[in-house]
Amino acid sequence: MRRLLLVTSLVVVLLWEAGAVPAPKVPIKMQVKHWPSEQDPEKAWGARVVEPPEKDDQLVVLFPVQKPKLLTTEEKPRGQGRGPILPGTKAWMETEDTLGHVLSPEPDHDSLYHPPPEEDQGEERPRLWVMPNHQVLLGPEEDQDHIYHPQ
């Protein structure tokens, strides 16, 4: 099987080199430069530059720009309430609270399966020792060497 594949590949390569198999040609219309050169950044980024909305009077009239206030973690003295709640802030805070329990470490449930260490138990309690089962022998023990040492 390998020989057949090898021979077929060699025949195809030889025919291609000899010119018997026509090489695939791309029409001239299809030869398009896909990547812009590094020396022409205007073409790469586009010739038109969009100005920010503050400088464009038409957009400011349609969409008034409100600069959002930054939320700070500083505590305000009593008597001063919270400032105005920006639109979307409440939803953001609810999302943060919702994800808080997911992002926190999982609770420790080891005490359900393992007793606390002796230092944490406080007073010392008597230890319960498990006694092995004792077999009371009456008379001499039977010789069982033949089980472990076959002859």
Swiss-Prot record:
Organs and tissues of expression: Highly expressed in the intestinal epithelial cells (at protein level). Abundantly expressed in the epithelial cells of the liver, kidney and cervix. Significantly down-regulated in hepatocellular carcinoma and right colon adenocarcinoma compared with the respective adjacent normal tissues. Expressed in epididymis (at protein level).
Inducing or repressing factors: Up-regulated by butyrate, trichostatin A and 5'-aza-2' deoxycytidine. Induced by DNA-damaging agents in a p53/TP53-dependent manner in HepG2 liver cancer cell line and HCT116 colon cancer cell line.
Compartments where located: Secreted; Endoplasmic reticulum
Region Disordered, annotated ranges: 71-151
Pfam families: PRAP
Keyword set, alphabetical order: Endoplasmic reticulum, Lipid-binding, Secreted, Signal
Matching InterPro entries: PRAP
Main location: secreted
GO cellular component, as recorded: endoplasmic reticulum; extracellular region
Function: Lipid-binding protein which promotes lipid absorption by facilitating MTTP-mediated lipid transfer (mainly triglycerides and phospholipids) and MTTP-mediated apoB lipoprotein assembly and secretion. Protects the gastrointestinal epithelium from irradiation-induced apoptosis. May play an important role in maintaining normal growth homeostasis in epithelial cells. Involved in p53/TP53-dependent cell survival after DNA damage. May down-regulate the expression of MAD1L1 and exert a suppressive role in mitotic spindle assembly checkpoint in hepatocellular carcinomas.
Subunit structure: Interacts with isoform 1 and isoform 3 of MAD1L1. Interacts with MTTP.
PANTHER family: PROLINE-RICH ACIDIC PROTEIN 1
Protein name: Proline-rich acidic protein 1
Biological classification of the source: Eukaryota, Metazoa, Chordata, Craniata, Vertebrata
